[in-house]
Each structure stands twice: as C-alpha cells, then as structure tokens.
C-alpha cells in the first residue's frame, strides 16, 4: 500500500533531517505528539513559496484524521526582511479559511521568517487555539 507521503511526493524524514533541510528548528504544537515528519516540494502545498522545501509535521487527531503543520523558512533579504508573495502574511496577519470538506486552514509568517500553515478538520475557533500553541 502507498503511504499518504508517497502519494503527495512527500517523504518521511527524521526530526534532525527536517531541521537541517529547513535551516532551523522545526515548529511543533506544544503539548501534542507528532505522528511523523515529512518533507516535500512547495508544489504540494497551496500558497507555499516556490523553490523552498516544505517540512510537514503530521499529527493524528482522536478521530483518526490527519492534522498538518506545514512550514517553510523564508530566507531574509539584505535588510533582514523575509519577502513573501502574500500581502496579508507580510502585514503580520494570520489568514483563516475553511474548505468545503470541513478542513480549516490557518496561514501565517512568524517572527523568525517561517511561513506556516496548519490544516485540520476542526472549526476555525479550535484552529485559532492550536495556532497559539505553535512554537
């Protein structure tokens, strides 16, 4: 059987390899234990910055659904700014949305230049609580 990682061109990696590939610490959700970590192309994540690998921390919810914490580390320019092709994220806001299948997504740029998205089959209010636990 094919794993979810192989179907989406994401590959299983160790936490150490993920940190090496992203060029810094991997963000996780405080108080939750990851199921595994994957790495894959930006093309596998809507809105991801091209030409930068995506590290995906996968969590399993109590009802067996996958919760995905995708992250890219955006390189700083000469001024220390982390340029990203998204005015909402550049302004420091977190973008929230819910897809027709009930999956809610939060996307933001943290102070260290990580573009992060958290996707889970939960209401947006619950997702907002989880976003506050990402470190």
Regions found by a protein language model. Give the residues of each.
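Short, solvent-exposed recognition patches
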Residues: 2-114, 119-132
């Amino acid at each position: 059987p094919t794993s979810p990682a192989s179907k989406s061109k994401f590959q299983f990696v160790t936490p150490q390899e993920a940190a090496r590939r992203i060029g810094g610490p991997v963000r996780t959700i405080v108080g939750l234990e990851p199921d595994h970590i994957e790495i894959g192309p930006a093309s596998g994540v809507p809105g991801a910055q091209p030409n930068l690998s995506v590290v995906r921390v996968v969590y399993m919810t109590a009802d067996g659904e996958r919760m995905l914490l995708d992250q890219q580390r955006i390189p700083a320019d000469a001024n220390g700014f982390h340029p990203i092709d998204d005015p909402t994220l550049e302004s420091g806001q977190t973008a929230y949305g819910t897809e027709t299948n009930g999956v809610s997504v939060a996307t933001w740029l943290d102070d260290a230049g990580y573009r992060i998205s958290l996707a889970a089959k939960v209401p947006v209010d619950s997702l907002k609580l989880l976003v506050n636990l990402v470190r």
